[in-house]
Protein backbone atom coordinates (compact mmCIF):
# COMPACT_ATOMS: atom_id res chain seq x y z
CA UNK A 1 0.00 0.00 0.00
CA UNK A 2 1.13 3.53 -0.79
CA UNK A 3 0.62 4.98 2.69
CA UNK A 4 0.40 8.55 1.37
CA UNK A 5 -2.54 7.56 -0.83
CA UNK A 6 -1.82 10.26 -3.40
CA UNK A 7 -1.81 8.01 -6.45
CA UNK A 8 -5.10 6.49 -5.32
CA UNK A 9 -6.70 9.94 -5.14
CA UNK A 10 -6.04 11.59 -8.50
CA UNK A 11 -7.80 14.80 -7.49
CA UNK A 12 -5.30 15.66 -4.75
CA UNK A 13 -2.69 17.46 -6.92
CA UNK A 14 -5.40 19.83 -8.17
CA UNK A 15 -6.70 20.56 -4.65
CA UNK A 16 -3.49 20.49 -2.63
CA UNK A 17 -2.26 24.08 -2.86
CA UNK A 18 -5.72 25.46 -2.07
CA UNK A 19 -6.25 23.55 1.20
CA UNK A 20 -6.12 26.29 3.84
CA UNK A 21 -3.94 24.49 6.44
CA UNK A 22 -1.42 23.64 3.70
CA UNK A 23 -1.39 27.09 2.11
CA UNK A 24 -0.96 28.79 5.49
CA UNK A 25 1.89 26.64 6.84
CA UNK A 26 4.84 28.61 8.17
CA UNK A 27 7.53 26.17 7.05
CA UNK A 28 8.54 27.55 3.64
CA UNK A 29 10.79 30.34 4.95
CA UNK A 30 12.39 27.88 7.40
CA UNK A 31 13.35 25.42 4.67
CA UNK A 32 14.47 28.13 2.24
CA UNK A 33 16.73 29.59 4.93
CA UNK A 34 18.19 26.14 5.66
CA UNK A 35 18.86 25.71 1.94
CA UNK A 36 20.55 29.10 1.68
CA UNK A 37 22.71 28.38 4.73
CA UNK A 38 23.84 25.11 3.15
CA UNK A 39 24.74 26.80 -0.13
CA UNK A 40 23.25 23.86 -2.00
CA UNK A 41 22.76 21.68 -3.81
CA UNK A 42 19.63 20.49 -1.99
CA UNK A 43 17.60 17.30 -2.35
CA UNK A 44 13.97 17.52 -1.27
CA UNK A 45 12.15 14.24 -0.63
CA UNK A 46 8.39 14.34 -1.06
CA UNK A 47 8.55 17.58 -3.04
CA UNK A 48 4.89 17.34 -4.05
CA UNK A 49 3.55 20.33 -5.96
CA UNK A 50 6.71 22.38 -5.40
CA UNK A 51 5.38 24.35 -2.45
CA UNK A 52 8.90 24.49 -0.92
CA UNK A 53 10.97 23.53 -3.96
CA UNK A 54 10.04 26.53 -6.12
CA UNK A 55 10.75 29.19 -3.45
CA UNK A 56 14.09 27.47 -2.81
CA UNK A 57 15.01 27.75 -6.49
CA UNK A 58 13.86 31.38 -6.47
CA UNK A 59 16.35 32.01 -3.65
CA UNK A 60 19.21 31.01 -5.95
CA UNK A 61 19.75 27.45 -4.72
CA UNK A 62 20.07 24.39 -6.94
CA UNK A 63 17.48 21.85 -5.85
CA UNK A 64 16.38 18.37 -6.92
CA UNK A 65 12.90 17.17 -5.96
CA UNK A 66 11.87 13.53 -5.61
CA UNK A 67 8.28 12.33 -5.23
CA UNK A 68 6.45 9.02 -5.65
CA UNK A 69 3.32 10.60 -7.14
CA UNK A 70 3.39 11.44 -10.85
CA UNK A 71 0.30 13.62 -10.37
CA UNK A 72 2.02 15.74 -7.73
CA UNK A 73 5.15 16.00 -9.89
CA UNK A 74 3.15 17.20 -12.88
CA UNK A 75 1.63 19.93 -10.68
CA UNK A 76 5.17 20.85 -9.64
CA UNK A 77 6.31 21.01 -13.26
CA UNK A 78 3.40 23.31 -14.14
CA UNK A 79 4.38 25.59 -11.28
CA UNK A 80 7.98 25.63 -12.46
CA UNK A 81 6.98 26.45 -16.05
CA UNK A 82 5.43 29.68 -14.75
CA UNK A 83 8.78 30.78 -13.29
CA UNK A 84 11.61 32.70 -15.02
CA UNK A 85 14.12 30.56 -16.89
CA UNK A 86 16.87 31.01 -14.30
CA UNK A 87 14.56 29.57 -11.61
CA UNK A 88 13.56 26.68 -13.88
CA UNK A 89 17.21 25.84 -14.54
CA UNK A 90 17.97 25.55 -10.82
CA UNK A 91 15.20 22.99 -10.17
CA UNK A 92 14.91 19.38 -11.32
CA UNK A 93 12.18 16.95 -10.35
CA UNK A 94 11.83 13.23 -10.87
CA UNK A 95 9.72 10.33 -9.72
CA UNK A 96 11.18 8.05 -7.11
CA UNK A 97 10.61 6.15 -3.88
CA UNK A 98 12.19 7.82 -0.85
CA UNK A 99 12.94 4.36 0.55
CA UNK A 100 15.13 3.35 -2.38
CA UNK A 101 16.59 5.82 -4.85
CA UNK A 102 19.93 6.40 -6.54
CA UNK A 103 20.64 9.79 -8.11
CA UNK A 104 24.36 9.37 -8.67
CA UNK A 105 25.38 12.56 -6.89
CA UNK A 106 25.73 14.05 -3.39
CA UNK A 107 24.03 17.03 -1.75
CA UNK A 108 24.90 19.46 1.00
CA UNK A 109 21.38 19.23 2.40
CA UNK A 110 18.46 16.81 2.24
CA UNK A 111 15.04 18.04 3.37
CA UNK A 112 11.74 16.24 3.97
CA UNK A 113 9.17 19.00 4.55
CA UNK A 114 5.64 18.49 5.88
CA UNK A 115 5.77 14.94 7.20
CA UNK A 116 6.17 12.51 4.27
CA UNK A 117 8.60 10.60 6.51
CA UNK A 118 5.55 9.58 8.55
CA UNK A 119 4.09 7.75 5.55
CA UNK A 120 6.86 5.21 6.14
CA UNK A 121 4.94 3.02 8.53
CA UNK A 122 7.56 0.44 9.54
CA UNK A 123 11.02 0.72 11.05
CA UNK A 124 12.66 -1.05 8.06
CA UNK A 125 11.08 1.52 5.73
CA UNK A 126 12.29 4.39 7.91
CA UNK A 127 15.83 3.00 8.05
CA UNK A 128 15.84 2.37 4.29
CA UNK A 129 14.98 6.02 3.72
CA UNK A 130 17.67 7.25 6.11
CA UNK A 131 20.19 4.93 4.46
CA UNK A 132 19.34 6.38 1.04
CA UNK A 133 19.65 9.90 2.47
CA UNK A 134 23.05 9.03 3.92
CA UNK A 135 24.29 7.78 0.54
CA UNK A 136 23.33 11.10 -1.05
CA UNK A 137 24.87 13.48 1.49
CA UNK A 138 28.27 15.09 1.26
CA UNK A 139 30.58 14.68 4.25
CA UNK A 140 29.10 16.65 7.18
CA UNK A 141 25.94 17.20 5.13
CA UNK A 142 22.66 17.75 6.93
CA UNK A 143 19.17 16.29 6.99
CA UNK A 144 16.30 18.58 8.01
CA UNK A 145 12.75 17.27 8.37
CA UNK A 146 9.59 17.74 10.40
CA UNK A 147 6.96 15.42 11.82
CA UNK A 148 4.03 16.06 14.12
CA UNK A 149 4.65 15.63 17.82
CA UNK A 150 2.18 12.90 18.85
CA UNK A 151 -0.47 14.02 21.32
CA UNK A 152 -0.96 11.38 24.00
CA UNK A 153 -4.46 12.71 24.68
CA UNK A 154 -5.44 12.42 21.02
CA UNK A 155 -3.95 8.95 20.69
CA UNK A 156 -6.07 7.82 23.63
CA UNK A 157 -9.29 8.71 21.81
CA UNK A 158 -10.92 5.85 19.92
CA UNK A 159 -11.03 5.94 16.12
CA UNK A 160 -14.80 6.19 15.80
CA UNK A 161 -14.92 7.11 12.11
CA UNK A 162 -16.81 10.34 12.80
CA UNK A 163 -16.07 13.22 10.46
CA UNK A 164 -14.77 16.44 11.96
CA UNK A 165 -15.25 19.81 10.30
CA UNK A 166 -12.21 21.72 11.51
CA UNK A 167 -11.07 23.63 8.42
CA UNK A 168 -12.17 26.71 6.48
CA UNK A 169 -13.72 25.94 3.08
CA UNK A 170 -11.84 26.89 -0.07
CA UNK A 171 -12.68 27.64 -3.70
CA UNK A 172 -10.83 26.29 -6.72
CA UNK A 173 -9.96 28.53 -9.69
CA UNK A 174 -12.79 26.99 -11.74
CA UNK A 175 -15.36 28.00 -9.12
CA UNK A 176 -15.83 24.69 -7.33
CA UNK A 177 -16.39 25.14 -3.60
CA UNK A 178 -14.76 22.56 -1.35
CA UNK A 179 -15.23 21.59 2.29
CA UNK A 180 -12.73 19.12 3.72
CA UNK A 181 -13.40 16.90 6.70
CA UNK A 182 -11.25 14.36 8.47
CA UNK A 183 -11.99 11.07 10.15
CA UNK A 184 -9.90 8.41 11.87
CA UNK A 185 -10.69 4.86 10.81
CA UNK A 186 -8.15 2.99 12.91
CA UNK A 187 -5.49 3.67 15.54
CA UNK A 188 -3.06 0.79 15.79
CA UNK A 189 -1.41 1.61 19.10
CA UNK A 190 1.00 -1.32 18.82
CA UNK A 191 2.37 -0.29 15.42
CA UNK A 192 1.78 3.43 16.14
CA UNK A 193 -0.05 3.79 12.81
CA UNK A 194 -3.15 5.89 12.19
CA UNK A 195 -5.38 5.10 9.21
CA UNK A 196 -7.58 8.02 8.30
CA UNK A 197 -9.57 9.61 5.50
CA UNK A 198 -9.67 13.16 4.24
CA UNK A 199 -13.15 13.63 2.78
CA UNK A 200 -13.72 16.42 0.26
CA UNK A 201 -17.26 17.66 -0.36
CA UNK A 202 -17.25 19.50 -3.69
CA UNK A 203 -20.01 21.78 -4.98
CA UNK A 204 -19.73 22.54 -8.69
CA UNK A 205 -20.83 25.91 -10.14
CA UNK A 206 -23.89 24.20 -11.67
CA UNK A 207 -24.92 22.93 -8.22
CA UNK A 208 -23.79 19.35 -8.74
CA UNK A 209 -22.21 17.80 -5.63
CA UNK A 210 -19.44 15.28 -5.26
CA UNK A 211 -17.78 13.41 -2.39
CA UNK A 212 -14.10 12.51 -2.86
CA UNK A 213 -12.02 10.47 -0.42
CA UNK A 214 -8.27 10.37 0.21
CA UNK A 215 -7.26 7.49 2.49
CA UNK A 216 -3.81 7.57 4.08
CA UNK A 217 -1.67 6.08 6.84
CA UNK A 218 0.78 7.89 9.08
CA UNK A 219 3.06 6.51 11.75
CA UNK A 220 3.39 8.36 15.04
CA UNK A 221 7.05 8.90 15.92
CA UNK A 222 8.12 10.21 19.29
CA UNK A 223 11.11 12.47 19.81
CA UNK A 224 13.59 10.01 21.29
CA UNK A 225 12.43 7.24 18.97
CA UNK A 226 13.35 9.54 16.06
CA UNK A 227 16.70 10.38 17.64
CA UNK A 228 17.53 6.68 18.01
CA UNK A 229 16.58 6.07 14.37
CA UNK A 230 18.86 8.89 13.28
CA UNK A 231 21.75 7.65 15.44
CA UNK A 232 21.32 4.13 14.09
CA UNK A 233 21.54 5.54 10.55
CA UNK A 234 24.75 7.49 11.20
CA UNK A 235 23.43 10.94 12.10
CA UNK A 236 23.85 13.14 15.14
CA UNK A 237 21.00 15.48 16.09
CA UNK A 238 22.09 19.11 16.27
CA UNK A 239 18.73 20.78 16.95
CA UNK A 240 15.16 19.82 17.81
CA UNK A 241 12.60 22.60 17.39
CA UNK A 242 8.95 22.92 18.37
CA UNK A 243 8.00 25.28 15.54
CA UNK A 244 9.39 26.95 12.45
CA UNK A 245 10.52 30.02 14.37
CA UNK A 246 13.01 27.63 16.02
CA UNK A 247 11.41 27.62 19.46
CA UNK A 248 13.12 24.92 21.52
CA UNK A 249 11.43 21.57 21.88
CA UNK A 250 9.24 21.48 24.98
CA UNK A 251 8.21 25.11 24.77
CA UNK A 252 4.77 24.07 23.51
CA UNK A 253 2.70 20.90 23.37
CA UNK A 254 2.13 19.07 21.22
CA UNK A 255 3.68 21.41 18.63
CA UNK A 256 5.93 20.21 15.84
CA UNK A 257 9.01 18.01 15.93
CA UNK A 258 11.64 19.54 13.63
CA UNK A 259 15.03 17.87 13.40
CA UNK A 260 18.35 19.16 12.12
CA UNK A 261 20.74 16.21 11.91
CA UNK A 262 24.32 16.01 10.65
CA UNK A 263 25.89 13.04 8.93
CA UNK A 264 28.76 11.84 11.10
CA UNK A 265 30.03 8.64 9.46
CA UNK A 266 29.00 5.69 7.34
CA UNK A 267 27.58 2.97 9.56
CA UNK A 268 26.97 -0.75 9.34
CA UNK A 269 23.57 -1.71 7.97
CA UNK A 270 21.25 -3.49 10.38
CA UNK A 271 18.05 -5.40 9.76
CA UNK A 272 14.70 -4.07 10.90
Residue spans of the language-model regions?
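A short glycine-rich, Lys/Arg-flanked "PGG" loop and its adjoining helix->strand segment in the class I
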Residues: 127-139
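Conserved class I S-adenosyl-L-methionine
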Residues: 1-48
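Conserved SAM/SAH-binding loop-helix junction
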Residues: 51
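C-terminal lobe and adjacent flexible extensions of AdoMet/dcAdoMet transferase-like proteins
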Residues: 217-272
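SAM-dependent methyltransferase
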Residues: 145-227
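Class I SAM-dependent methyltransferase SAM/SAH-binding core
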Residues: 54-100
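A short acidic, Gly/Pro-enriched loop at the edge of an enzyme's catalytic core
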Residues: 102-109
Amino acid sequence: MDASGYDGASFIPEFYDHVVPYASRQDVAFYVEAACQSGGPVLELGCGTGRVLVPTARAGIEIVGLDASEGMLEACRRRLRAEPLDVQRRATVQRGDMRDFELGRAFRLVTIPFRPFQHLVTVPEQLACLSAVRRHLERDGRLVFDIFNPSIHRLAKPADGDETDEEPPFTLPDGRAVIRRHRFLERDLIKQVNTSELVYYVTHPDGRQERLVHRLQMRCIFRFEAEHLLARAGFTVEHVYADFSRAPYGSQYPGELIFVARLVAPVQEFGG
